[in-house]
Regions:
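His/Glu-rich zincin catalytic helix
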Residues: 1-65, 77, 104, 193-308, ...
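M16 family metallopeptidases and their MPP-like homologs
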Residues: 27-38, 63-170, 191-195, 203-205, ...
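Charged, well-ordered internal alpha-helical segments
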Residues: 172-182, 408, 442
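Bilobed periplasmic-binding protein-like "clamshell/Venus-flytrap" ligand-binding domains
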Residues: 176-195
Length: 575
């Protein structure tokens, strides 16, 4: 109650586009933004709906007109609320041979449709239904419940207004949206930032400041911490999962085992088909899944599928890992049957489209080239090479010529073949077992004799000798990782000690590694270390230590890291 209120000088209206450029090694992209009133303004309800009408990952204007039509490499948009001024942002990445100005014009054309009312009015109701579902899903977690209080506090909103938001949104009309868009999303009232590849011609050098190490005070406690620690609270009694009592299993048909857990919290369902095969078995699986998402059937176009799924507040996705693949359908439980019918119909009856496939191949090759310009992506590829070895990379990666040689028939056959394999079904939702079994029988049509798939796991590389692996990247900072695998197998009895060690030593911002490397010595932007627990009973433990730091601090950072790893600082209070 004694906190000062936020006061700020109002900004001058933007009457002509504000144009800025930034340069760097990463791939080119463009972002545009319009200034909106602060989070407490009554129009904020409209801005969030407009953001989802423009882009929602399924059936928004950008989704269907740009991404689904493959007119850009990728594009998105959203409203971002802040206490003083909020913003409405749209952004995109260019295809091969496409200029940033062309991407800009495509984005501006989609925003213009909001001003002109050139969108389906049904999107408003669908957006509100999806917003309700997202709230229900988020409220399954205490973090999300708490953060709503935090955002309300930060924006200075009355809590009664916060909880009545859905009621207000349900009264918003298409004309309200058109009026709002004309008021705030003017054709000239935006700022635009071009991210271009290359060296900044106006780059300015800043002298590196001298950093004086500080003595950590992890054994000291503030009055605030002491007050919290001495407060009386009701002890939390842990509840451990009993897989025989807390969930159930049944067989939908031979070769299809269902793991079932009833959702007692809300009306949201999640249904996942899990196949024990992935990119180690077939590196083209992800391309096949991506291709399918652009296709329609003889009854529904791809746009109709996306719009219908969004209208019933459901979604679906297909993805492949190294050793497992997933087909997931989720959303409002009352619409599960309809969603399953749409997804299963697409899987069984997708109509090939060679133009889409050629565009998809070109976009994948462009995305690969862009990834090579990104330091984090390059470092991630180096990590996989270090941990899994060159054979793993070859098995799980399509070369560009192999990618170009794949046909529609081959890709769709891969998905069809997958549905002829044994798999698990995971269900979490409000329906009872009998209803789930009936839904699977009605919509999950499979052959009577499914082929078995053996469960496999990726093999980690042992570290029999010291090696250094380097990926050159011309940047002012570096990413450094140590990896050690002595072949020690999973031991259930050691699990508590390992978890405790990781929490104390290197698992977060309040650990020895972060405090010593960043806070005390100023030698890293980020640092962590842990003993990784295997993901399967036959897997190996392996040790990993990571530093992100400036190039000129590398030697000192590595030496300090080795010192605290080999001679771990001890603090009884921190422990």
């Amino acid at each position: 109650p004694n906190l000062p209120k936020l006061h700020f000088e109002p900004e001058q209206p933007i009457t002509t586009p504000v144009v800025k450029e930034v340069y760097g090694l990463e791939a080119a992209n463009v972002m545009l933004g319009w200034r909106l009133p602060g989070a407490n303004d009554k129009s904020t309800d409209i801005s969030d709906i407009v953001g989802s009408i423009l882009y929602n990952g399924q059936a928004g204007l950008i989704d269907l007109d740009l991404n689904q039509q493959q007119k850009v490499l990728s594009a998105y948009g959203y409203a971002s609320t802040q206490p003083d001024y909020s913003s409405f942002l749209v952004a995109g990445r260019p295809k091969t041979g496409q200029s940033l100005d062309e991407v800009r014009d495509l984005l501006l054309a989609e925003v213009a449709k909001l001003r002109d009312g050139d969108f389906d009015e049904n999107l408003i109701e669908a957006t509100i239904n999806n917003y309700k579902m997202q709230l229900m899903r988020s409220f399954e977690e205490n973090d999300s419940r708490a953060i709503l209080y935090v955002y309300s506090f930060i924006s200075g909103a009355d809590w009664a207004d916060e909880v009545a938001r859905i009621d207000r949104m349900s009264k918003i009309t298409k004309q309200d949206i058109v009026d709002w868009a004309n008021k705030y999303l003017g054709p000239e009232s935006y700022a635009i930032v071009y991210k271009r590849e290359g060296k900044d011609p106006n780059e300015q050098k800043i002298a590196a400041p001298k950093i004086t190490p500080i003595v950590t005070n992890r054994d000291s406690q503030s009055e605030f911490l002491s007050e919290i620690q001495t407060s009386q609270v009701q002890p939390i009694e842990p509840v451990f999962v009993d897989y025989k009592k807390d969930m159930s299993q049944f067989e939908a048909q031979k070769g299809v085992n269902v793991l079932y857990k009833k959702n007692e919290t809300n009306d949201i369902f999640t249904l996942i088909y899990v196949f024990n095969t992935g990119t180690e078995n077939d590196p083209a699986l992800n391309l096949a899944f991506d291709y399918l998402s652009y296709l329609g059937t003889d009854k529904m176009s791809a746009e109709q599928i996306a719009s219908e799924m969004y209208a019933i507040a459901c979604s679906f996705g297909l993805s492949a890992g190294a050793n497992q693949s997933w087909i997931e359908v989720s959303g409002l439980s009352e619409n599960m049957g309809k969603a399953m019918e749409i997804v299963e119909g697409l899987i069984a009856g997708a109509q090939p489209n060679e133009e889409i496939l050629q565009n998809l191949k070109g976009d994948m090759i462009k995305s690969r080239a862009d990834a090579k310009l990104n330091q984090s992506r390059c470092f991630g590829a180096l990590q996989r090479y270090m941990i899994y070895g060159s054979d793993f990379i070859r098995r799980t990666t399509l070369t560009d010529p192999a990618l170009q040689g794949l046909t529609s028939e081959q890709l769709l056959a891969k998905i069809g073949d997958l549905m002829g394999k044994q798999h698990e079904v995971l269900y979490y939702g409000p329906q009872d077992e009998a209803e789930v079994k009936a839904a699977l029988a009605a919509h999950h049509k499979l052959a009577a004799d499914l082929q078995p798939l053996e469960k496999k796991f990726s093999t980690l590389q042992p570290t029999d000798e010291n090696k250094v692996m380097l990926a050159q990247y011309d940047a002012k900072q570096l990413y450094y990782m140590q990896y050690s695998n002595r072949g020690e197998k999973f031991d259930l009895a050691a699990d508590p000690q390992i978890t405790l060690y990781n929490e104390y030593f290197g698992g977060g911002m309040n650990t020895i590694v972060f405090q010593e490397m960043r806070e005390a010595r100023g030698l890293a932007y980020s640092a962590w270390a842990n003993l990784a627990i295997p993901t399967n009973a036959k897997g190996d433990y392996y040790y990993m230590a990571f530093i992100a730091t400036q190039n000129d601090k590398m030697q000192k950072a590595i030496e300090a890291f080795d010192e605290i790893i080999n001679n771990m600082p001890e603090s009884e209070k921190a422990f």
